[in-house]
Structures are given as structure tokens and as C-alpha cells.
A protein has these predicted regions:
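A short, solvent-exposed beta-edge/loop patch
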Residues: 4-21, 25, 113-209
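General structural signal for secondary-structure boundaries
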Residues: 13, 34, 53-56
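Alpha-helical transmembrane signal-anchor/signal-peptide segments
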Residues: 26-44
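Generic detector of short, well-ordered, non-transmembrane alpha-helical segments enriched
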Residues: 40-44, 106, 172
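Hydrophobic/aromatic-rich, well-ordered segments within soluble, folded domains that form packed cores
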Residues: 41-42, 48-50, 178-180
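Short, solvent-exposed recognition patches
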Residues: 48-166
Length: 209
């Protein structure tokens, strides 16, 4: 039997434990901001686009998202597939997004080395680069955006926001994923058309409404 002197402390702990439940079950658990993926134009850096033909349920099935698009941008024979997704389940976006976005399509490829780079034209952007395996040319670049910041280290993001995510409204993360099937061998990331396309998409998305 619990001693009476511990009752106040137990009550406090129970009350604290109930806060996340009350917030996410009875309150407005999702924060609605002003950003939408449809703010990204169908023409970027001279590349015109058409829908990729992905199933309408793709975003919901893989990312629990209704705010997403996937387009094939082409210019003078070059083609880059751009996928943008917003989700209140951040892990679905930052944990190997290529598994859902790139595999199982004609752009599909086995990626090798992963690194994060910063280009001089946009040093604030941590661009995640997925290099092709030996003999392949497909390359993918992606950027993650959450609550006004770009995410460079998803593990640190998860650690830093663990408590906040429990006691506050959920906020959406946004993935910008550019997939180039014919990148040159050992390219300079800054000079890739996919990099320019990715930057233009992000600038359009974040432009003041």
C-alpha cells in the first residue's frame, strides 16, 4: 500500500503523464501552417514538368500525407524527378526516404554512399546526397525542413525534439527529393541541374504568402 506522504507526488506524476494524452486526443493535435507543396511551380529553372503517374494513394500509404506531389521535370533531354511531401510523421520522411520515393520506379536504383553537403550558392541548405553504386549513374538529393529550420542530422533532430513532440502540437516536416537518373560520374554537386531545381523548389515553397 502506498504511503499517504507519496500521494501528492504520485498525483503530480500522473497529471504530467496525462498531458500528452489530453493534447493529442482532445485538443488540436496538429499545427496548421501556411505552407503547401502546391506552391512549388510546375516550371522550375527552365524545366517543364508533368505528373509522374504515381498512385494517388502513394503519399497516404507511405507517409500518412495528403499534401504531396511527384513530377518529372524535363529540359533538353535531361530529366529530374521531384517529389515533395509534408507529413506529421517526421520519421517517415527522414528515415531512408529513398526506400519509398526511389525504389520501385523506373528511376529506381541502388544507392551507395550518403553524405551531407553545403553549396556556396545556398550554404544554409544541408543537402543530403545519395551517391550511386559503382557502374550506376542515378543520384538523389534531398532536403528536410521542419518548423522553420533545415534538418541536417535526423538523429539529433529526434533527440532534441522528443520531449517537445510529447507536450505540444505536432508540426509537419517537409521532404524535397530530387532524383536524377543520368548524373555524370563524380559530379560537383553544386553544378548539378538537380541541385538548382531543388533550390528553386524550396525557395518557391518558403516564399512569403
Amino acid at each position: 500500500m502506498t504511503s499517504a506522504r507519496y500521494v501528492p507526488a504520485v498525483c503530480v506524476l500522473v497529471a504530467i503523464a496525462l498531458v500528452p494524452t489530453l493534447i493529442h486526443s482532445y485538443g488540436e493535435s496538429e499545427y496548421i501552417d501556411a505552407y503547401r507543396t502546391d506552391a512549388i511551380p510546375t516550371v522550375l529553372t527552365g524545366y517543364e514538368s508533368v505528373p509522374s503517374g504515381r498512385s494517388r494513394n502513394f503519399g497516404l500509404e507511405h507517409f500518412d500525407s495528403k499534401d504531396w506531389f511527384e513530377r518529372n521535370y524535363t529540359k533538353a533531354g535531361d530529366e529530374v524527378r521531384l517529389t515533395s511531401v509534408r507529413s506529421y510523421d517526421p520519421k517517415s520522411l527522414y528515415h531512408h526516404p529513398e526506400l519509398a520515393v526511389a525504389y520501385g520506379t523506373r528511376f529506381g536504383a541502388t544507392f551507395g554512399r550518403h553524405e551531407v553537403v553545403h553549396v556556396s550558392a545556398a550554404p544554409e541548405l544541408p543537402i543530403h546526397v545519395l551517391h550511386p553504386t559503382q557502374g550506376a549513374r542515378a543520384m538523389a538529393l534531398y532536403v528536410l525542413h521542419y518548423d522553420g529550420e533545415f534538418v541536417e542530422d535526423p538523429v539529433w533532430f529526434q533527440v532534441r525534439n522528443a520531449a517537445t513532440l510529447l507536450f505540444s502540437q505536432r508540426k509537419p516536416m517537409t521532404l524535397f527529393f530530387a532524383h536524377d537518373l543520368a548524373a555524370p560520374p563524380d559530379p560537383k554537386i553544386e553544378d548539378l541541374p538537380a541541385t538548382a531545381l531543388l533550390r528553386a523548389a524550396i525557395d518557391s515553397f518558403l516564399a512569403p504568402r
